[in-house]
């Protein structure tokens, strides 16, 4: 990447009472628009217990007024439970909301409706939910979810049409479609495999299947046969959601052509991850604004590593959105809303972390679902109010610019590779490899287009064409031994530099060789106890004289049992390759291994990594591509210990950076020297679970 042009950003505080001075959605749904944002998009999602009662509703608005600026938007859920409402019950809610929204506008907020169930989430409150001649969401084994319905059912489509017609006629400022519009539903797992869906698939492909026959064909046969059928089913899933969105868009925009529509998502691999196309459909012929709410898990702070994990999930989702979608509000979820389940500081950090990963704001679903006073929630509201200026500064500085750094390879077809050699495809799970590499200070990226180094894992390589694979191998690549075997089998051996000789499942320890990338850690050992954490240790053999060994294997007597388990190679395409055969995805958190990995990834990138944390700290880092001659990045101390003397290596000629803490306190830091293309900046201290924003 090009060297970063010197730029000193001047921040000025903008009153929190005004809405962002941009459209709420899309100007043109393409990848060229880069709308300037001056503050974050923030909203609160409000349950029916807080708006059906006049007393509770007034108290809610008074609380928001007390902390004016904590939110710009107040969004109302249509109901509380997760199966679809009857039309009569839905109309009663909407009639109340029409009045409530007028009161909200009178207080100076934008307001809209979040339709909790379009097709339904799962089995809950079934006795008081929608019943009738509708087809339930059906699993591959023929089991059904009684709380969710097939969106291809004609009767359900008429129900949905009336649902969105009533909602639009209530005159909200916007409408949100919730994440029940997906194809994974409890208790069946993935659907829909009802008889009607099989008939639609037959029309799409010309192939007729029973459920049993389809399941067998998806899991048996040659690799190419399975990949072809699975890819066709993913397209069928994309089409199913596209048809639903055509119905919603036409219903809404027939009444109000300019009505903004928003959609909430998670990782949608089985659905085909067709966000760009779905967004264009929702915009309609008049190109109405489209909003997005990427989400995932992390409902409490019991497992704090889930915070960054959710940011990575969200970053993937944002990476495929058209740039013209500017209102990208992360889902901040504290379900079931028990205040001690997630600390206020963690809620603030979560919103900040998701902004760092690509969002432009946050939608807070954090308040009570009971008809009770909000006294226990006021400290959380106050803490979010204090943090609003930091959210604004982050969005102003980062905008919708692309992340650059290390990408874990995936694409819209990645789900076709799950359980490719054995097992049930439909239950394969997330196709993207999970790893610790992003926790040691390497910059996370979610797009192959903007990656400086690419991580290959699982069977994901089968989702790419041979031309795409060759292009990937012409750049920096880190892979495990299983991927090496796949690539060599596919005919790419001349570009990988190694082959697998054998694997062993017990009593193997990695030992670092003498090599410049290992620095002073030659001879260090890494024992990840295969008897506890099961993972094969692979022995690699060089297939090219230019390969270099970074580590071998020893046993518990110290005897060498493998000359090479990790090595590097530069191929004739100019690509730099690292193959890791010993715990390639985990146990990176000691000094020697984390230092080695940073050296390796810098080497793989040919010094094109935009930044990394060189010091020994548990850090998550996000760096944006330069925009208008400036760069911005954010990092989190993802530890319960203070991080002292954090060393940020930044590819720039600038010798001065501005560092902002989460109270927007600015510190100017001078470079402590340079290393090649990188300047070295030392941040004195970062408290536990705190973020820093860096601007230059």
Predicted regions and their residues:
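Hydrophobic targeting/anchoring helices
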Residues: 28, 48-51, 67, 72, ...
């Amino acid at each position: 990447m090009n060297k970063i042009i010197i730029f000193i950003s001047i921040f000025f505080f903008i009153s929190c009472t005004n809405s962002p001075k941009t459209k709420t959605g899309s100007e043109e749904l393409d990848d060229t628009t880069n709308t300037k944002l001056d503050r974050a998009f923030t909203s609160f999602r409000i349950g029916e217990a807080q708006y059906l009662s006049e007393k509770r509703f007034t108290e809610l608005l008074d609380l928001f007024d007390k902390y004016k600026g904590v939110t710009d938007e107040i969004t109302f859920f249509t109901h509380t439970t997760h199966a679809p409402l009857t039309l009569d019950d839905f109309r009663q809610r909407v009639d109340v909301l029409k009045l409530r929204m007028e009161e909200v506008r009178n207080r100076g907020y934008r307001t809209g409706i979040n339709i909790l169930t379009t097709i339904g989430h799962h089995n809950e409150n079934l006795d008081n939910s929608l019943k009738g001649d509708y087809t339930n969401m059906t699993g591959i084994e023929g089991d059904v979810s009684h709380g969710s319905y097939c969106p291809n059912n004609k009767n359900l489509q008429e129900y949905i049409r009336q649902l969105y017609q009533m909602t639009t006629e209530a005159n909200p400022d916007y409408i949100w479609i919730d994440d029940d519009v997906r194809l994974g539903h409890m208790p069946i797992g993935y659907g829909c495999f009802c008889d009607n869906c099989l008939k639609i698939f037959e029309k799409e492909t010309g192939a007729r299947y029973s459920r049993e026959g389809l399941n067998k064909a998806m899991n048996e046969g040659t690799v190419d046969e399975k990949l072809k059928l699975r890819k066709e089913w993913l397209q069928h899933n994309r089409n199913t959601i596209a048809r639903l969105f055509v119905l919603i868009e036409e219903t809404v925009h027939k009444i109000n052509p300019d009505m903004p529509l928003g959609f909430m998502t998670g990782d949608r691999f089985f659905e085909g991850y067709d966000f760009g196309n779905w967004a264009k459909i929702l915009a309609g012929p008049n190109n109405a604004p489209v909003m997005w709410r990427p989400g995932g898990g992390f409902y409490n702070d019991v497992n704090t590593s889930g915070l960054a994990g959710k940011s990575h999930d969200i970053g993937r989702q944002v990476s495929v959105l058209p740039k013209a979608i500017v209102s990208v509000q992360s889902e901040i979820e504290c379900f079931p809303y028990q205040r001690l389940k997630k600390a206020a500081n963690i809620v603030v950090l979560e919103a900040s972390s998701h902004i760092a990963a690509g969002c432009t704001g946050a939608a807070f679903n954090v308040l009570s679902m009971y008809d009770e006073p909000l006294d226990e929630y006021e400290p959380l509201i106050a803490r979010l109010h204090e943090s609003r200026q930091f959210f604004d500064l982050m969005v102003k500085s980062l905008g919708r610019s692309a992340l650059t750094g290390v990408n874990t390879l995936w694409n819209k077809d990645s789900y076709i590779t799950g359980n490719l050699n054995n097992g049930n495809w439909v239950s394969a799970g997330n196709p993207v490899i999970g790893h610790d590499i992003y926790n040691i200070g390497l910059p996370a990226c979610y797009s192959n287009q903007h990656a400086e180094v690419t991580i290959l894992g699982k069977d994901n390589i089968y989702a790419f064409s041979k031309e795409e694979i060759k292009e990937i191998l012409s750049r920096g690549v880190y892979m495990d031994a299983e991927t090496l075997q796949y690539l060599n089998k596919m005919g790419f051996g001349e570009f990988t530099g190694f082959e697998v000789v054998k694997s062993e499942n017990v009593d193997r320890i990695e030992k670092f060789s003498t090599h410049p990338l290992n620095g002073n850690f030659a001879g260090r050992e890494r024992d990840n106890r295969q008897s506890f954490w099961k993972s094969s240790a692979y022995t690699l053999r060089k297939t090219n004289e230019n390969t270099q060994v970074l580590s071998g294997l020893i046993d518990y007597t110290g005897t060498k049992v493998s000359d090479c388990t990790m090595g590097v190679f530069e191929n004739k395409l100019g690509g730099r390759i690292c193959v890791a055969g010993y715990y390639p995805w985990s146990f990176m958190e000691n000094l020697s291994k984390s230092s080695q990995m940073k050296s390796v990834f810098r080497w793989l990138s040919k010094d094109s990594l935009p930044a990394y944390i060189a010091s020994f700290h548990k850090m998550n880092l996000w760096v944006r591509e330069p925009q208008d001659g400036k760069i911005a990045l954010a990092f989190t101390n993802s530890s319960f210990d203070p991080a002292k003397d954090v060393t940020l290596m930044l590819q720039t000629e600038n010798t001065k950076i501005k560092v902002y803490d989460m109270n927007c306190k600015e510190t100017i830091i001078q470079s402590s020297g340079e290393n090649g293309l990188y300047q070295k900046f030392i941040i004195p201290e970062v408290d536990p679970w705190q973020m820093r924003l860096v601007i230059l």
